[in-house]
Amino acid sequence: MNEQQNQTRSFVQAKLSEFSKRVSQGYHKPVRSFFKDMLMGICGTGEPSLHNIAKFIQDNTSTKKTSERLYCNIRRANLAEDIEDFLTDLIRPQVTDDTLFIVDDSDIAKPYAKSMEGCGKVHNGSESKSTNGYLLMNIFALLTKQDGYSLLPASSILFAPSIEPDSAKQVLQDKIVNQQIAFRNNGTYVFDRGYDDRKLIGFMVDNGVSFVIRGMGLRAIKEGIVEKNFKEEVDKMKFKYKLPGLRKNEEFHCATRRIGVRTDDHPSKKASSVEISLVVVRKYRDGSRKGKDFYLLCDFDDPHMPEKEVIARAIDTYRRRWAVEEVHR
């Protein structure tokens, strides 16, 4: 290991020790040691496996005894809630209206698990195959700094693969309500296509939560008591706004309009609905159209926001989410 690697290692260890002290403040010494061991172990092994963390920790005891100690501490009542409360307190002073809350699905693979509660088949995206494990819903806070951005965890929710979709949606909605109370209704939530869901859209609008969802382009557009074909309505839109693209010689041709989204499961004349903005982006490079239309469903709790501002804010919001994903890949 060269000098630069040693310096980096020492720097990371010092930062982790400092963070561990803050997280475990108020706990007894054994619990404080547990927090530090877990943080160092996860960073050192690259995975949240207690057995591998136990092997990584050098505490002059057997791997078996170290594993038992870690298992004992991780079963402590309200441990997850205490950690999340700490993260909320850590983030709260830094949250502004420009903050993005990035909602991202993931998974934890447990390929050798045979009797773990709730464990089931999940798609392991990193290996592109099905394996045993759990579903994970993460919410990250992307905070604007003077010298760039800071990405901090705001919440992490573990699900059994067998959970009913409506139950998972309710857990997410409860989490958003709690965060909006804690963060004084600041920030914008950003979702990928898997969250293009009428119930979620209705919930966000009804609670005055700003959001951007990448649309799938499949839902009908509600106008009065009539529901119209999405693609046909998009073809009628005027692409009169032009913005710089993400690459050289690239330009976005954009259009937006307010649309109605039915929030009831089944269409009817009395079906409930909410109104949001639809932003459609067409990519042009060197004057030629490239790719398919890109749809963003959004609402910034300001019905009087000018169209160009809606477009620019929606694109910039999703661009920042996309940039974070690229870095993690």
Task: List the predicted regions and their residue ranges.
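Single, function-defining residue in the core of a domain
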Residues: 1-44, 86, 110, 114, ...
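Active-site-proximal, Lys/Arg-enriched surface segment
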Residues: 39, 67-146, 260-265
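Short, charged amphipathic recognition helices of the HTH superfamily
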Residues: 45-55
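Short, basic interhelical loop/turn and adjoining N-cap
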Residues: 56-69
